[in-house]
């Protein structure tokens, strides 16, 4: 049944007030603070209907109402307005998520995680997706000092790893380029399982007197492929939960911290598959997380999902602000990853 406009406006006012103040909302508060053009008595009757419909709930007979999970869902789907970013906020996002072709993806994403936590005042979580059977896309070798070479490895999933190796004698740039060409011709497209003894011996044979260079490179090569084949979970701003007075309660705080410290739970909660996903309270599949909301989105490299970034907090988070921040940050991550791919 379609809810009438007046009830929607009252519900919107209740949720906005509860998000901002964390206190149950009464009809007199709505009548005074929100210019709805109706009396407190009418609002009270409408609130009784909203409670009966399951959109708000009353904690005690003498208290006002607070939104239910069902109420928040209607709010997110139909009532909230996504704000525009200020120029200062847009500049902050672009400045923090650095654009650099040699910038390692995990560092870029960790910067984005810190930024989301800072801008939303909530706990931000990043889950890097498992890139099973990752392979080498390219290897670059650069002289940086006498007897020191910078090795840059890039996998198909966009992971970049920089390593410095020391060599016994200086190597000319032309020789270094030839070594890199041989390595790329032999290793490009190979997974860690495919780099077997036969491949290694063939590379050393082609490198001749520079075979020792490959011995120095191999451990780093294996490291990046192992890293690309694993799933990592990072978090930032855990203590931000204490910005919400209700989490001064030791039991509620312990409940939240136990969720944040459980990698299995975070791995399940942060499973967005496309654009921004919002899971509210009981919509979370994990029982321990049913007092919280999770807002997350996938970031991509070359069109391929590379990880999930999002926040977890109480159900009264400022949804419109959080969704906008995550949308903008993910767009900026994707733009930078695309530039890396084209560089």
From Swiss-Prot:
InterPro entries assigned to the protein according to its UniProt record, in alphabetical order: GAF-like_dom_sf, HrcA, HrcA_C, WH-like_DNA-bd_sf, WH_DNA-bd_sf, WHTH_HrcA_DNA-bd, WHTH_transcript_rep_HrcA_IDD
Keyword terms, alphabetized: Repressor, Stress response, Transcription, Transcription regulation
Chain coiled-coil ranges: none
Domain of life of the native organism: Bacteria
Gene Ontology BP term (one): negative regulation of DNA-templated transcription
SUPFAM superfamilies: GAF domain-like, Winged helix' DNA-binding domain
GO molecular function, a single term: DNA binding
Protein's UniProt keywords contain Signal: no
One Pfam short name: HrcA_DNA-bdg
Keyword Aminoacyl-tRNA synthetase: no
Induction: By heat shock.
Record family assignment: Belongs to the HrcA family.
Biological role stated in the UniProt entry: Negative regulator of class I heat shock genes (grpE-dnaK-dnaJ and groELS operons). Prevents heat-shock induction of these operons.
Alphabetical list of PANTHER family matching this protein: HEAT-INDUCIBLE TRANSCRIPTION REPRESSOR HRCA (PTHR34824:SF1)
Protein name (Swiss-Prot/TrEMBL): Heat-inducible transcription repressor HrcA
Organism this protein belongs to: Clostridium acetobutylicum (strain ATCC 824 / DSM 792 / JCM 1419 / IAM 19013 / LMG 5710 / NBRC 13948 / NRRL B-527 / VKM B-1787 / 2291 / W)
């Amino acid at each position: 049944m379609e809810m009438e406009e007046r009830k929607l406006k009252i519900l919107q006012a209740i949720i906005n007030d509860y998000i901002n103040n964390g206190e149950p909302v009464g009809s007199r508060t709505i009548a005074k603070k929100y210019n709805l053009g109706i009396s407190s008595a009418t609002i009270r009757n409408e609130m009784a209907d909203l409670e009966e419909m399951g959109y708000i709930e009353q904690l005690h007979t003498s208290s006002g109402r607070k939104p239910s999970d069902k109420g928040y869902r209607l709010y997110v789907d139909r009532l909230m307005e996504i704000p525009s970013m200020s120029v200062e906020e847009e500049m902050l996002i672009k400045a923090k998520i650095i654009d650099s072709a040699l910038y390692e993806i995990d560092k870029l994403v960790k910067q984005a995680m810190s930024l989301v936590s800072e801008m939303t005042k909530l706990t931000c979580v990043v889950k890097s997706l498992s890139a099973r059977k990752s392979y080498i896309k390219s290897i670059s070798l650069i002289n940086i000092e006498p007897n020191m070479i910078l090795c840059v490895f890039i996998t198909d999933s966009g992971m970049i790893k920089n390593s410095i190796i020391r060599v016994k004698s200086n190597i000319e740039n032309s020789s270094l380029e030839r070594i890199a060409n041989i390595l790329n011709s032999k290793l490009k497209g190979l997974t860690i399982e495919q780099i077997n003894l036969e491949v290694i011996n063939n590379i050393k044979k082609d490198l001749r007197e520079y075979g020792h260079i490959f011995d120095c490179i191999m451990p780093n090569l294996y490291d990046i492929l192992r890293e690309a084949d694993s799933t990592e979970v990072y978090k930032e701003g855990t203590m931000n939960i204490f910005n919400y007075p209700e989490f001064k309660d030791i039991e509620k705080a312990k409940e939240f911290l136990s969720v944040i410290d459980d990698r299995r739970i975070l791995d399940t909660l942060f499973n967005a598959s496309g654009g921004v996903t919002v899971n509210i309270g009981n919509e979370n599949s994990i029982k321990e997380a049913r007092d919280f909301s999770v807002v997350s989105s996938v970031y991509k490299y070359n069109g391929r999902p590379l990880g999930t970034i999002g926040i977890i907090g109480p159900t009264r988070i400022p949804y419109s602000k959080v969704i906008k921040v995550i949308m903008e940050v993910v767009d900026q991550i994707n733009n930078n990853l695309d530039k890396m791919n084209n560089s």
